[in-house]
């Protein structure tokens, strides 16, 4: 009678496999911590105040803040009054990147947030629910001499959320409001070397456009993009891991198909988990270096969503296959209560992502959070997804508790067995608990490293060595889940090792005649083998 590899592997060999995987895990963390730079870089920009004195501003004219063709600038708005420059003639210009630098496709994406400096004036205060309306043009070019090509031109409304901490008295005029930063722009590729933003604040008192927004002093932008060095390390990891997971996946399914019976549910789920991991690993990002694929961020979100949905489903089915009886097991329909919240939560997050990054494919300035309706809709999707996640973990914790309770109850049968069989089943129980604890450790490490990467400065210094904590988090956790899936497909593949007849059920020493098993893989042509019977009878009772 055959079983899964994990059932027939000696403790020594299991420790060797675990040690090898641990070494690869440490290497994954070290690659990010010692080789890769920080994942992202933030660059601050202050918009230059250019003057566009044309009679009409309907035709786009690109105004450069610096360089040989720089615009006619003013330092502040006080200078505009004696020169009879109207608010509609002022254009806030930002060149990306800073002088003597250029952007690169290795940066992968650009994310910008907006900070508006607004001074307090008694006769020009920010009214309640004030909204600033910006006319924004985004252009690009690939050298310093070509004409700018328009990439996007949109009206961008943003609600101002500002507070003034001092008393609103004449002596405090000129002090700045404390305003929340605003989402401004996100682009899913960096296909060009130079970008130019021209921001206008058109004033129309009749239509109440840009009226009651205070006295704007400056517009500041913070641009965030992925570091090119980190991108290269990330691509290298994906390129290395893709064939590794693909090969073990093919090997695993080949061993399944060599059996004289159809695959069982758990085997199918493990294989599907391998497919979803391979889907994440395939380094299609290499094409983004040569092609302007702005949809790569959305595509990456979808790939991650599929993997995590499969991972959560695997945990439920893995536990459930150790509890259900022969009639209930091996059918996905038996898990609709547990898998249902996963499907609903994943669908809600998918809709939210499509409403945000899906729209940004045509309008990079769009954000679902900028309107009251959009904010309520986004919060509704997130809350529903959060409720589904909580329900899922309640189901999962209950099922894990049930499995461990059933196994503990069955351990009372072990003393009646022969020494060889007792040691064998003690090993099986140990390995099952070991896998459950490893799963818990992987989930805990993901949460812990995420928290650490958020609360630390981004790097640690030990002597002369600098460790990039955030990069180590990304590469380490990414490598960890790859190793987890690799270990699942290796350890739960059917073993070709057979037990002798002397280790048949009659030698168990269990007078009730029940067969003790631990996992759920069925590898004998006539029925279940070394997989799940240890807990099945308890569930039936």
Swiss-Prot record:
This is Protein wntless homolog. The chain crosses the membrane at residues 16-36, 233-253, 269-289, 304-324, 332-352, 381-401, 432-452, 472-492. Disulfide bonds: none annotated. Keywords: Cell membrane, Cytoplasmic vesicle, Developmental protein, Endoplasmic reticulum, Endosome, Glycoprotein, Golgi apparatus, Membrane, Transmembrane, Transmembrane helix, Wnt signaling pathway. Belongs to the wntless family. Interacts with WNT3A. Interacts with WNT1, WNT3 and WNT5A. Residues 1-15, 254-268, 325-331, 402-431, 493-541 are cytoplasmic. Residues 37-232, 290-303, 353-380, 453-471 are lumenal. It holds the Pfam family WLS-like_TM. One of its GO terms (biological process) is positive regulation of Wnt protein secretion. InterPro entries: WLS-like_TM, WLS_GOLD, Wntless. N-glycosylated.
């Amino acid at each position: 009678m055959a079983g899964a590899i994990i059932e027939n592997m000696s403790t020594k060999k299991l420790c060797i496999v675990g040690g090898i995987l641990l070494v690869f895990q440490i290497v994954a963390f070290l690659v990010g911590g010692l080789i890769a730079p920080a994942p992202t870089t933030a660059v601050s920009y202050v918009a230059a105040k250019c003057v566009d004195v044309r009679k009409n501003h309907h035709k786009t004219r690109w105004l450069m803040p610096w360089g040989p063709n720089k615009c006619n600038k003013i330092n502040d708005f006080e200078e505009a009054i004696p020169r009879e420059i109207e608010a509609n003639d002022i254009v806030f210009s930002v060149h990306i990147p800073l002088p003597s630098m250029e952007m690169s496709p290795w940066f992968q994406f650009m994310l910008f947030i907006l900070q508006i400096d607004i001074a307090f004036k008694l006769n020009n205060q920010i009214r309640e629910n004030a909204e600033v309306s910006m006319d924004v043009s985004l252009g690009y070019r690939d050298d310093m001499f070509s004409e700018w090509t328009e990439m996007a031109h949109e009206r961008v409304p943003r609600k101002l959320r500002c507070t003034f901490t001092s008393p609103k008295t004449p002596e405090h005029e000129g002090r700045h409001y404390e305003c929340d930063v605003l989402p401004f722009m996100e682009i899913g590729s960096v296909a060009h070397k130079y970008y130019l933003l021209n921001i206008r604040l058109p004033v129309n008192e009749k239509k109440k456009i840009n009226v009651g927004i205070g006295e704007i002093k400056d517009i500041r932008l913070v641009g965030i993009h992925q570091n090119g060095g980190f991108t290269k390390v990330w691509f290298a990891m994906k390129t290395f891991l893709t064939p590794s997971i693909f090969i073990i996946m093919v090997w695993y399914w080949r061993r399944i198909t060599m059996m004289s019976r159809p695959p069982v549910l758990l085997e199918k789920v493990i294989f599907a988990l391998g497919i979803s991991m391979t889907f994440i690993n395939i380094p299609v990002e290499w094409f983004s270096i040569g092609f302007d694929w702005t949809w790569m961020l959305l595509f990456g979100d979808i790939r991650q969503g599929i993997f995590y949905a499969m991972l959560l489903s695997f945990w439920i089915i893995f536990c459930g296959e150790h509890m259900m009886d022969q009639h209930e097991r091996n059918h996905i329909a038996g898990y609709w209560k547990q898998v249902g919240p996963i499907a609903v939560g994943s669908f809600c997050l998918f809709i939210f992502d499509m409403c945000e990054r899906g729209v940004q494919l045509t309008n990079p300035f769009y954000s679902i959070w900028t309107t009251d309706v959009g904010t309520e809709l986004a919060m509704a999707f997130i809350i529903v997804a959060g409720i589904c996640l909580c329900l899922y973990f309640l189901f999962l914790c209950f099922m894990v508790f049930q499995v461990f309770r059933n196994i503990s109850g069955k351990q009372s049968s072990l003393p009646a067995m022969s020494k060889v069989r007792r040691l064998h089943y003690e090993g099986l129980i140990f390995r099952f608990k070991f896998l459950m604890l490893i799963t818990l450790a992987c989930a805990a490490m993901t949460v812990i490293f995420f928290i650490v990467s958020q609360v630390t400065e981004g790097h640690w210094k030990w002597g002369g060595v600098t460790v990039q904590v955030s990069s180590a988090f990304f590469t380490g956790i990414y490598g960890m889940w790859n190793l987890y899936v690799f270990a699942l497909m290796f350890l739960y593949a059917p073993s070709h090792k057979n037990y002798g007849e002397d280790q048949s059920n009659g030698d168990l020493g269990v007078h009730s005649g029940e067969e003790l098993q631990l996992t759920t893989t069925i590898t004998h042509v006539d029925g279940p083998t070394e997989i799940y019977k240890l807990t099945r009878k308890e569930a039936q009772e």
